[in-house]
């Protein structure tokens, strides 16, 4: 089998599997906010919450306008993101997809329970992760021509509008390349990647309203309703929640109040 054929098969498998397992119900409050953003994008009304994830919402909105099905819209983006995660994982590890190692890597990422859940969930995590991997590949392994690096900086700007909290994943190579010559060109590429989503948000929300939403959500997340030591100082509970998130959510293992199927 040729490499390009293997990638086509992988892409088809990612899309079909995620579409078949798409969900048409709201799992949690964050999913509700992203679902409501398809009807009316309004950060001030927490549709979704700040920072708004405009790049992700934009592409999901396009899918929703075409298929008129919320579950399918999010799963299409999830399927594409799953393929991108596998693709750039293979690139970063310099692994051929048609090799035994490549097939194994593709298999464990494709069937990873957390990855599968996130590909169907109404959240931007997987899309943000796929962009972060693309940026890391360009910054670390790709030929470091100015044109290639400019693409990496542009994608970094898009990453800020997809999943801002994932920017630290690429921060070290980002800074290293930024200070090594052609500063203005690289910074301009990053700024373009940011402005392409920031200008529409400011026009839609209003600058003052956006700043107020940012202030309320940032302070609230770290001092009121977020999962920090300030909002929950019981370290035993925090440790148990950590174990649950890794074992049950990440590895798909059994936990109280979860389906008995997870025991298998």
Where are these regions (language model features)?
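Transmembrane signal-anchor helices characteristic of membrane glycosylation enzymes that use polyprenol
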Residues: 2-29, 40-41, 160, 192-211
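Transmembrane-helix signature of polytopic, membrane-embedded enzymes
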Residues: 4-8, 89-112, 129-130
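Short helix- or helix-capping micro-motifs
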Residues: 11-14, 102-113, 137, 156-160
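Short acidic/glycine- and proline-prone juxtamembrane loop motifs at membrane-interface regions
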Residues: 29, 50, 114-127, 209
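Loop-to-helix entry region of an early transmembrane alpha helix in multi-pass inner-membrane enzymes
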Residues: 51-54, 58, 66-84, 118-122, ...
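Membrane-lumen/periplasm interface segments of multi-pass, membrane-embedded glycan/lipid transferases
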Residues: 54-58, 62, 209-264
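Transmembrane-helix motifs of polytopic, lipid-linked glycan transferases
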Residues: 76-96, 133-138
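Perimembrane helix-loop-helix junctions
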Residues: 168-195
């Amino acid at each position: 089998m040729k490499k390009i054929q293997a990638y086509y098969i992988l892409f088809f498998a990612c899309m079909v599997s995620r579409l078949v397992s798409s969900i048409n119900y709201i799992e949690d409050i964050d999913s509700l906010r992203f679902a409501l953003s398809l009807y009316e994008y309004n950060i001030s009304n927490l549709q979704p919450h700040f920072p708004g994830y405009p790049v992700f919402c934009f592409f999901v909105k396009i899918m929703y306008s075409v298929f008129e099905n919320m579950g399918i819209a999010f799963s299409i983006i999830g399927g594409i993101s799953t393929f991108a995660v596998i693709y750039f994982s293979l690139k970063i590890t310099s692994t051929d997809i048609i090799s035994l190692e490549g097939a194994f890597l593709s298999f464990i990422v494709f069937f990873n329970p957390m990855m599968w859940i996130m590909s169907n969930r109404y959240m931007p995590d997987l899309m943000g992760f796929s962009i972060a991997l693309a940026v890391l590949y360009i910054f670390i392994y790709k030929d470091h021509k100015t044109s290639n690096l400019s693409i990496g900086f542009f994608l970094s700007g898009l990453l800020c509008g997809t999943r801002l909290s994932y920017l630290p994943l690429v921060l070290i190579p980002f800074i290293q390349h930024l200070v090594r010559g052609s500063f203005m060109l690289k910074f301009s590429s990053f700024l373009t990647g940011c402005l392409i989503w920031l200008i529409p948000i400011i026009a839609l929300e209003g600058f003052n309203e956006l700043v107020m939403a940012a202030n309320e959500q940032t302070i609230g997340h770290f001092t009121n309703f977020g999962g920090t030591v300030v909002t929950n100082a019981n370290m035993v509970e925090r440790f148990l929640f950590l174990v649950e998130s890794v074992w049950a959510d990440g590895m798909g293992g059994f936990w109280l109040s979860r389906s008995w199927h997870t025991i298998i």
